[in-house]
Structures are given as structure tokens and as C-alpha cells.
């Protein structure tokens, strides 16, 4: 028999049950139609579940026990930086002076919030080697869009309207070409070298007076540093373009080097990656965008400025791309990031150094049984290409599904696309060597199982709440809304 707690809450609803009690009404009751015209009232009952309080508590507690996150276990999702989120950050975000304010309040009544955002702007700019930031973008892809809009505004002010193309390597994040298209650019894809680095000859052949810029991640999606970055920056700038930094992998280089020093002109951060704010489940995230000095005038309005001892919202920006989000960004997330940066200070460099150390440790321990396509020192993450031995029918997907039986969230699989059977692993700096060893041991045991009992992997997972689903059918026939049977 199906447990009530494996059902939707609508399925355990029983007419007449309720999870609340109200005091006896002490005012005269009136008919709703006497207050609101009938044409504005729905003629349908609200189809809400009728459940008791204990049913509500048990239902959602059971659901929470089925979840997996950084608070419950190791989460090595490559290109996502699933680091632990310190609870001090949460404490600061719910302080009454931050949690109980409203963006419609007069500036003089929210000086603390404006001061925090102004200082965070300066901190993030310093880490990236930029002049100023905007904190408005909601997340990474939104930040990409804003950065590309800044690039477009720059060329427009110069009267260089023929620059309608953005160069993007084939190893780039999938959001890069999507963001470029939404910003109104045509995408020019160039081939990467086998190690994921930019192919200089391909770049040279793509550059022209129609190129607005190049979008690049450094370290690359394969977790390797772009050693030719100075040459790349010079080539793009000599051709009249701008260099855009996708900050997805900033966790590898904080305090070690800065995108601005490499020659990048525009950058976005993923606050929810690098600066330890919660992510997953749809947000909220945060994707601040930074620019070099001559691009500041194009940043979204308003920009927070300090005049004397007062912080103000500056809307007088004739060349601004305009407002790109309601109000001023995801403020609660910004409080968490500000707390994180204050907590670490100069030790942000150690964050990146340990992230790199952890990744290299794992890579070294796993390369005996898993194929390592590029054998060199990595940065914060690395990419494996399936098992070292070609075991008929055992795929990276099978390995990932079997990891679920060992109690782990799998790494990113089949990305980047330039590596066959790719597994992208990013341990982050917050994990101990004991945790890393346990995960390494699980992966190595799975490699042994693949040789001895391959069917165990092909039919995995065996012990999860949901077994292997038909992913093709799920993609083609997506049902995300419950409807009552007629």
C-alpha cells in the first residue's frame, strides 16, 4: 500500500479537515457579494487540500528527508561550486535592520543597507580588478546579459554599430551563447584546443570589425588556466572588441590573480557560487557585473554613491543601459556575501588555494581507474572521461546513478561537450580530506563493480526513493502540474 507520505498533499486531502482554528467572530458577518460586485468574484471553489496540522507537518518533513544538499552531504557538482554556506551569513541576513526594511523607504531611513551595498560594490570590484560593480542582476545568466548590454552600449556610443557579433569558444558555459542571442548579438563559435583552451588561430580567423567582444571563462570549463590570456586580450582589443569574463570559476583565483589584470573589461560574478550564498531550488541568486573605468557610465541605474557621509541612489546617468531589475538586486543574498567577505578578508586567497588543492588531490587519486583526458595540474575542478577500461555498455550515466546508492549527489556529467563521457568534479575548499577520501573510495568501488557486475550499474540506483526514470520521456512529456481526476 502506498504510504501517505509518498503522495502529493492533494492526494491525502479529506473534506472537512483543517490545520487551523479561529476565534469566534466578534463583528457582524456580512455576505461577500454585498462588499464586492459579483462580476469580480470567482464562481469556482478554491481547490486547496484539506488536511490536519499533523498531516502537514509529517508530509513536508518526509519531503525534506528526501532532499539532498550541502548541509546533508558532499556535493561535487562541477561548474557549480557547491560549497558550504556558513550559518553566520544567515544570522546577519535576518537582522531586523536588514530584514524589516522596504525598498520604497526614503534613502535617509535605509542608510545602513545602502552603505553595505556600496562597500560590497567596492570589495567585489577590488577582488576582480574592476572599477565599479552593479549589484542588480538576479543571477549569473542575468549578469551575462547585463554585461553584454554594457558592451553593446559602449560600441553604440562610439558609433560603431556594425559590431554585432560575439565570439564564444565551444567549451563555454551553455548560458553564454543564449545570453548573447538575447542581447541581440550573433554568435561566432570557435573551436577549442583539446585541453579546452582557446585556439589562437581560430580566434584570429574569427576577429573582424564586426566583433563586439569575446566571452571567456578562466580557468576554463575543464578547470585549466588559460595560459595565453594576455595574447588573447591583446588580439581582441587590437581588433576593437571587449573581453568578457564569465565569473563561474572565480573560486579558483581569488587573491591570486584578477580578471582585470588579465585584460578583461567586463565581468560577472556568481555570488551564489564564489561567496557562499545558498543556491539551487530556483534561487534567489545574484550576479553582480563589474566594468573597467571607461565603462562605468553604462552600468544600470541607479548606482549607489557616497556624498559626504550620506549614501544616495544616483539616477542621473545619461548613458546607462537603464534599470534591469526591480529595486536594487537580491538584497538578502548581498548581505550574506558581504558577511562572507568580511569573515575571510585577505584569507580569500586561502579559500581558492584549498579549492585547487582539493581538486588536484582528488584528480590524482582517481586517475588510476578513470580516464583523465588532460594530465596536468588543474585549478578548482577537473574532468574525467569515464572509466579507464572500456567496459562494454557501462556509461558515465550508469556511474552517476550508482553513486546515488552510495549516498552521494553525482558530479556534473556529459559536460563539457568536448570530452566524451565527461564527469566534471568540483570539491570546493570546504571539504575535509576524510570526506574526499570517502567519495574517492566510492567511485573506485564503482569502477570495480563495473568490471565484476556491470548490470549492477546499468540498473542503478537501487536504494533511492525514485529509481531510474525515462529521461527522454520526461523531457518530451513534461508534467509539472497536478490536476484532479475528473
Curated annotation (Swiss-Prot):
<keyword id="KW-0663">Pyridoxal phosphate</keyword>
<dbReference type="Pfam" id="PF21478">
    <property type="entry name" value="GcvP2_C"/>
</dbReference>
<feature type="modified residue" description="N6-(pyridoxal phosphate)lysine">
    <location>
        <position position="273"/>
    </location>
</feature>
<dbReference type="InterPro" id="IPR020581">
    <property type="entry name" value="GDC_P"/>
</dbReference>
<comment type="function">
    <text>The glycine cleavage system catalyzes the degradation of glycine. The P protein binds the alpha-amino group of glycine through its pyridoxal phosphate cofactor; CO(2) is released and the remaining methylamine moiety is then transferred to the lipoamide cofactor of the H protein.</text>
</comment>
<keyword id="KW-0560">Oxidoreductase</keyword>
<dbReference type="GO" id="GO:0005960">
    <property type="term" value="C:glycine cleavage complex"/>
</dbReference>
<dbReference type="GO" id="GO:0005829">
    <property type="term" value="C:cytosol"/>
</dbReference>
<dbReference type="Pfam" id="PF02347">
    <property type="entry name" value="GDC-P"/>
</dbReference>
<protein>
    <recommendedName>
        <fullName>Probable glycine dehydrogenase (decarboxylating) subunit 2</fullName>
        <ecNumber>1.4.4.2</ecNumber>
    </recommendedName>
</protein>
<comment type="similarity">
    <text>Belongs to the GcvP family. C-terminal subunit subfamily.</text>
</comment>
<dbReference type="GO" id="GO:0004375">
    <property type="term" value="F:glycine dehydrogenase (decarboxylating) activity"/>
</dbReference>
<dbReference type="GO" id="GO:0030170">
    <property type="term" value="F:pyridoxal phosphate binding"/>
</dbReference>
<dbReference type="InterPro" id="IPR023012">
    <property type="entry name" value="GcvPB"/>
</dbReference>
<dbReference type="InterPro" id="IPR015421">
    <property type="entry name" value="PyrdxlP-dep_Trfase_major"/>
</dbReference>
<dbReference type="GO" id="GO:0019464">
    <property type="term" value="P:glycine decarboxylation via glycine cleavage system"/>
</dbReference>
<dbReference type="InterPro" id="IPR049316">
    <property type="entry name" value="GDC-P_C"/>
</dbReference>
<dbReference type="InterPro" id="IPR049315">
    <property type="entry name" value="GDC-P_N"/>
</dbReference>
<dbReference type="GO" id="GO:0016594">
    <property type="term" value="F:glycine binding"/>
</dbReference>
<comment type="subunit">
    <text>The glycine cleavage system is composed of four proteins: P, T, L and H. In this organism, the P 'protein' is a heterodimer of two subunits.</text>
</comment>
<dbReference type="InterPro" id="IPR015424">
    <property type="entry name" value="PyrdxlP-dep_Trfase"/>
</dbReference>
<dbReference type="InterPro" id="IPR015422">
    <property type="entry name" value="PyrdxlP-dep_Trfase_small"/>
</dbReference>
Amino acid at each position: 500500500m502506498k504510504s501517505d507520505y509518498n503522495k502529493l498533499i492533494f492526494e491525502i486531502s479529506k473534506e472537512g479537515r483543517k490545520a487551523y482554528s479561529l476565534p469566534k467572530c466578534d463583528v457582524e458577518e456580512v455576505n461577500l457579494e454585498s462588499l464586492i460586485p459579483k462580476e469580480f468574484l470567482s464562481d469556482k471553489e478554491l481547490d486547496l487540500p484539506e488536511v490536519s496540522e499533523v498531516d502537514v507537518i509529517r508530509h513536508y518533513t518526509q519531503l525534506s528527508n528526501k532532499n539532498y544538499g550541502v548541509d546533508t552531504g558532499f556535493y561535487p557538482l562541477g561548474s557549480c561550486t557547491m560549497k558550504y554556506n556558513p550559518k553566520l551569513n544567515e544570522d546577519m541576513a535576518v537582522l531586523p535592520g536588514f530584514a524589516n526594511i522596504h525598498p520604497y523607504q526614503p534613502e535617509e531611513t535605509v542608510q545602513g543597507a545602502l552603505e553595505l551595498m556600496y562597500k560590497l560594490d567596492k570589495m567585489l570590484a577590488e577582488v576582480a580588478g574592476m572599477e565599479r560593480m552593479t549589484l542588480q542582476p538576479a543571477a549569473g545568466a542575468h549578469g551575462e546579459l547585463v554585461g553584454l548590454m554594457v558592451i553593446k552600449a559602449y560600441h553604440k556610443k562610439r558609433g560603431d554599430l556594425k559590431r554585432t557579433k560575439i565570439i564564444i569558444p565551444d567549451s563555454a558555459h551553455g548560458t553564454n551563447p543564449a545570453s548573447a542571442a538575447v542581447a541581440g548579438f550573433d554568435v561566432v563559435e570557435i573551436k577549442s584546443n583539446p585541453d579546452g583552451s582557446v585556439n589562437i588561430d581560430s580566434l584570429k580567423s574569427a576577429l573582424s570589425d564586426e566583433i563586439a567582444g569575446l566571452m571567456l571563462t578562466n580557468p576554463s570549463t575543464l578547470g585549466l588556466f588559460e595560459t595565453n590570456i594576455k595574447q588573447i586580450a591583446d588580439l581582441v582589443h587590437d581588433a576593437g572588441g571587449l573581453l568578457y569574463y564569465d565569473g563561474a570559476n572565480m573560486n579558483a583565483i581569488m587573491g591570486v590573480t584578477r580578471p582585470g589584470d588579465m585584460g578583461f573589461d567586463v565581468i560577472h560574478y556568481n555570488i551564489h557560487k564564489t561567496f557562499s550564498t545558498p543556491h539551487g531550488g530556483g534561487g534567489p541568486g545574484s550576479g553582480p557585473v563589474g566594468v573597467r573605468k571607461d565603462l562605468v557610465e553604462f552600468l544600470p541605474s541607479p548606482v549607489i554613491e557616497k556624498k559626504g557621509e550620506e549614501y544616495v541612489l544616483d539616477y542621473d546617468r545619461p548613458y546607462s543601459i537603464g534599470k534591469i531589475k526591480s529595486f536594487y538586486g537580491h538584497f538578502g543574498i548581498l548581505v550574506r556575501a558581504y558577511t562572507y567577505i568580511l569573515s575571510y578578508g585577505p584569507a580569500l586567497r586561502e579559500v581558492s588555494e584549498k579549492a585547487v588543492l582539493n581538486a588536484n588531490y582528488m584528480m590524482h587519486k582517481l586517475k588510476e581507474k578513470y580516464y583523465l583526458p588532460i594530465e596536468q595540474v588543474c585549478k578548482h575542478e577537473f574532468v574525467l572521461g569515464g572509466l579507464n577500461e572500456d567496459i562494454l555498455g557501462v556509461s558515465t550515466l550508469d556511474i552517476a546513478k550508482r553513486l546515488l546508492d552510495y549516498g552521494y549527489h553525482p558530479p556534473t556529467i556529459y559536460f563539457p561537450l568536448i570530452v566524451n563521457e565527461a564527469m566534471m568534479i568540483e570539491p570546493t575548499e570546504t571539504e575535509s580530506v576524510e570526506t574526499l577520501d570517502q567519495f574517492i573510495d566510492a567511485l573506485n568501488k564503482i569502477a570495480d563493480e563495473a568490471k565484476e557486475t556491470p548490470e549492477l550499474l546499468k540498473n542503478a540506483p537501487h536504494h533511492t526513493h525514485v529509481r531510474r526514470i525515462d529521461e527522454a520521456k520526461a523531457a518530451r512529456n513534461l508534467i509539472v502540474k497536478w490536476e484532479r481526476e475528473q
